[in-house]
């Protein structure tokens, strides 16, 4: 019966002076002719397990191929060592090499290797200490998000990946077809959002959410953009703008705090490697009231510092750039901030039109270091208003008739938002490039493997 490093590290006292059997990969090796110290990781924990090989028990001639990256199976006696920094070590009785290196130069020779270098080998980078921490937190965050929605009474809804509708209207889509170019007999793309379909399911289930890959053919080669990424998109019938903002803030604060509590080792490592105040900053947000301002007020505040921006052309109706969003969160409020009531020409066609005729009931939640993290709105439920807006934008009404029809039958209105999973992970880890928080990144001009 094999044990995992995670099982042993949680309750090392239960395994003290007992025989254990472990499978894993060598992450560090050092020693001399009489004793060898091997650090092992099996993927179950961020922590490594130190294994001690003594010549009196192990034939060193049979393990001369031991090296970084080699897969091994060991058995031996575990000793709990609370007086040391490590949780314990194993005095190895048997060691069997299960996966050798064909080349002694395993790509991850240095555990402190930079993220820039690791990007060139996405199939190996999870075996570095830094990327292991990021991926462990990614998995934990994934789980906490699903748990949050389950506890809030949401239904998980699987929106289609293939669609004939561009829900964002930006035209940045990947076209899908077979070699004969006639598979669907109409233009079909990879989905840019699951929102439109989620709206349909909210009318019946009330509270639904999607959590799935999203595809956008954006040619923006920035540290925040990817062609394939994951989106969390809840949709709630009967909800107003204020209620959906409250849900968005609650989601962030709950899942961030839970991830911090349950993943102490990863955060300690990340703080040593980068932001020393990472947890302090995140917990401050979790325990604070989030400031909410109008788009108009945001423009006024930014105009007071106009000379500090590369993009100085600020006016009512301009699209806020990342530098503006970050300035608001980092220099003015020093915290995440919610901006509401954007000009309708900056937002998608489906958003509720306010009485002023100029703005829509939309919101963006901005965070330090990134800018926009969440974008959402109250949806336009008035059939004629929605139709007029679609005509104004010269949209194909026939393609979206099903969406219009949702307004005809028992529609009380709904609200929802989209949260970029990778951007949230960037915020939580302090990692500055989206390519470093996703296993196999797909970006403009780049698709390794």
Swiss-Prot record:
Signal peptide: none annotated. The lineage of its organism: Bacteria, Bacillati, Mycoplasmatota, Mycoplasmoidales, Metamycoplasmataceae. This is Asparagine--tRNA ligase. It is an enzyme of class 6 (ligase). It is found in: Cytoplasm. Belongs to the class-II aminoacyl-tRNA synthetase family. Keywords: Aminoacyl-tRNA synthetase, ATP-binding, Cytoplasm, Ligase, Nucleotide-binding, Protein biosynthesis. It catalyses: tRNA(Asn) + L-asparagine + ATP = L-asparaginyl-tRNA(Asn) + AMP + diphosphate + H(+). InterPro entries: Aa-tRNA-synt_II, aa-tRNA-synth_II, aa-tRNA-synth_II/BPL/LPL, Asn-tRNA-ligase, Asp/Asn-tRNA-synth_IIb, NA-bd_OB-fold, NA-bd_OB_tRNA. Homodimer. Pfam families: tRNA-synt_2 (PF00152), tRNA_anti-codon (PF01336). The gene is asnS. Its EC number is 6.1.1.22. GO terms for cellular component: cytoplasm. One of its GO terms (molecular function) is nucleic acid binding. One of its GO terms (biological process) is asparaginyl-tRNA aminoacylation.
């Amino acid at each position: 019966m094999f044990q995992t490093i995670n099982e042993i590290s949680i309750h090392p006292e239960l395994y003290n002076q007992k025989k254990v059997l472990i499978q894993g990969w060598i992450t560090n090796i050092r020693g001399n002719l009489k004793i060898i110290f091997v650090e092992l990781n099996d993927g179950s924990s961020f922590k490594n397990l130190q294994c001690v090989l003594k010549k009196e028990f192990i034939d060193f001639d049979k393990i001369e191929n031991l090296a970084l990256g080699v897969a091994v199976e060991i058995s031996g006696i575990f000793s709990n060592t609370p007086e040391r920094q490590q949780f314990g070590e194993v005095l190895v009785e048997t060691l069997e090499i299960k996966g050798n290196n064909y080349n002694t130069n395993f790509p991850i020779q240095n555990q402190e290797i930079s993220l820039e270098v690791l990007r060139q080998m996405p199939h190996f980078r999870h075996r570095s200490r830094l990327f292991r921490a990021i991926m462990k937190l990614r998995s934990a965050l994934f789980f906490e998000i699903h748990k949050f929605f389950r506890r809030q009474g949401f239904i998980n809804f699987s929106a289609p990946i293939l669609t004939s509708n561009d829900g964002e209207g930006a035209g940045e889509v990947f076209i899908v077809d077979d070699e004969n170019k006639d598979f669907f007999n109409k233009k079909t793309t990879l989905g840019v959002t699951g929102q439109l379909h989620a709206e349909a399911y909210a009318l019946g289930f009330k509270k639904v959410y999607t959590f799935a890959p999203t595809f956008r053919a954006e040619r923006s080669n920035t540290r925040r953009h990817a062609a394939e990424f994951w989106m969390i998109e809840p949709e709630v019938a009967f909800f107003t703008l204020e209620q959906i903002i409250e849900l968005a803030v609650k989601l962030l604060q709950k899942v961030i705090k839970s991830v911090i509590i349950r993943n102490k080792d990863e955060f300690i490592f990340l703080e040593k490697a980068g932001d020393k105040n990472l947890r302090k900053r995140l917990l401050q947000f979790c325990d604070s009231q989030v400031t909410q301002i109008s788009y108009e007020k945001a423009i006024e505040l930014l105009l007071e510092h106009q000379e500090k921006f590369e993009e100085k052309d600020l006016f009512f109706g301009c699209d806020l750039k990342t530098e503006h969003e970050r300035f608001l969160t980092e220099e003015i409020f020093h915290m995440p901030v919610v901006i509401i009531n954007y000009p309708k020409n900056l937002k998608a066609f489906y958003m509720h039109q306010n009485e002023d005729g100029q703005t829509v009931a939309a919101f963006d939640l901005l965070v330090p270091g990134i800018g926009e993290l969440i974008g959402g709105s109250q949806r336009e439920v008035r059939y004629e208003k929605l139709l007029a807006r679609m005509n104004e934008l010269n949209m194909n009404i026939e393609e979206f008739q099903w969406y219009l029809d949702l307004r005809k039958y028992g529609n009380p209105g709904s609200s929802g938002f989209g949260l970029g999973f990778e951007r949230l992970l960037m915020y939580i880890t302090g990692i500055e490039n989206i390519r470093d928080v996703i296993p196999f990144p797909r970006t403009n001009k780049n698709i390794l493997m």
